[in-house]
């Protein structure tokens, strides 16, 4: 077996350069996020935008729920991939970043596909229990990840996808010296999903790591 390559920043940039191009508004969101200092870390990687776009196209996904929206890069990437009659519901509790995200959605003419709900996602998930989704993307507060994952089964279609970001947690999941609550929480989630007979799953090393689960 050949040696697996380590994804450095140079390799990540190379991947982005040779993948399909982002839209002007996606680039504008990235430029805006670059002005935010440490908060920029909440942005998904460009390679993850490409992955979300392609998985939606390949799987003929129509209805998506996003848990954690920030300034809208992942949501816009999802919306651009959806068919004209597709729908994305984006959950986030931050009113200020939601306003910014909505402004970008309008600029990209995708606002008709996207409904934003501004409140804690735990509450929103209970209120959405009568809806069904083809895909759920989880990228919010890490300490609630397991609850978001479990609640997703109430509203995901059979054969649907649950995709979870940050599951490699800057590589700290494999560092035995890291025992902070966030690292422990991500480790526990990964172990939980690995034993979950309701799904088949893989961790993909894009960005900070994504778990892709197909619901059986």
Predicted segments, located by residue:
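A short alpha-helical cap/connector motif
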Residues: 1-135, 142-163, 167-216
């Amino acid at each position: 077996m050949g040696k697996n390559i380590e994804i450095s920043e140079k390799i990540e940039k190379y991947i982005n350069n040779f993948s399909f191009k982002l839209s002007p508004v996606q680039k504008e969101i990235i430029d805006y996020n670059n002005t935010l200092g440490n908060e920029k870390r909440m942005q998904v990687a460009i390679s993850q935008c490409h992955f979300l776009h392609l998985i939606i196209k390949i799987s003929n996904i129509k209805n998506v729920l996003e848990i954690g929206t920030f300034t809208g890069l992942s949501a816009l990437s999802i919306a651009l991939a959806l068919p004209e009659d597709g729908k994305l519901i984006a959950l986030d509790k931050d009113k200020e970043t939601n306003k910014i995200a909505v402004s970008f959605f309008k600029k990209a003419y995708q606002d008709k596909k996207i409904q934003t709900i501004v409140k804690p996602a735990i509450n929103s998930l209970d209120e959405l229990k009568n809806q069904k989704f083809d895909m759920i993307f989880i990228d919010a507060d890490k300490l609630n990840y397991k609850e978001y994952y479990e609640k997703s089964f109430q509203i995901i279609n059979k054969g649907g996808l649950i995709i979870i970001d940050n599951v490699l947690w800057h590589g700290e999941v494999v560092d035995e010296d890291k025992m902070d609550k966030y690292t422990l929480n991500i480790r526990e989630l990964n172990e939980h999903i690995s034993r979950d007979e309701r799904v088949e799953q893989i961790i993909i090393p894009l960005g900070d790591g994504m778990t892709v689960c197909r619901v059986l």
